[in-house]
């Protein structure tokens, strides 16, 4: 049992863990976590709030989050919204008050399990129903999530560098190389790093053909990482 936070509802997915001390907004918005419930081992989550610039995708694909302690009050000059409100805004169900490190040990020893978490202020959970939802969920094996999270249309990345305290996210001029990035669930920060090297980046869908890509006459081609079963996305390569 824990305390519900974020969006009020129920989420079923593969329970994984993350040991990072910082970057929770980037982690939760990373498309690689599509279909997963993230268990954070670091106890103090939320201390820098959230902002409109650090998301790794234009949509949050994570199913849910699990924290050890209550969300920390934000204290950061870039913070625009506290994490609890941000989770509500993005419809992410969360639980706090769990022994996340013991859960991590279980995941490490037994493998990532299917799981369901539920946030209901009235306490009307229906445990049997939640268990059935978990058992019926097919899991990520054989699941192609690249098609779900990938861009549907080709677009040109606007060319902001990685963030610095002095300049924030700065736009790049005088681009020297053209890179085609195939989007299997690409993170925004990867695109920013290409901009650091003065690359003009064209992002294409995961099912773009070789002819489509070569027609753009790129200096290089980048295949991103992404969520789901790698065996199910091999067909695109």
Specify the residue positions occupied by each region the protein language model found.
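RNA-binding accessory domains that recognize and position tRNA/RNA substrates
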Residues: 1-217
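Cysteine-nucleophile active-site neighborhood
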Residues: 215-237
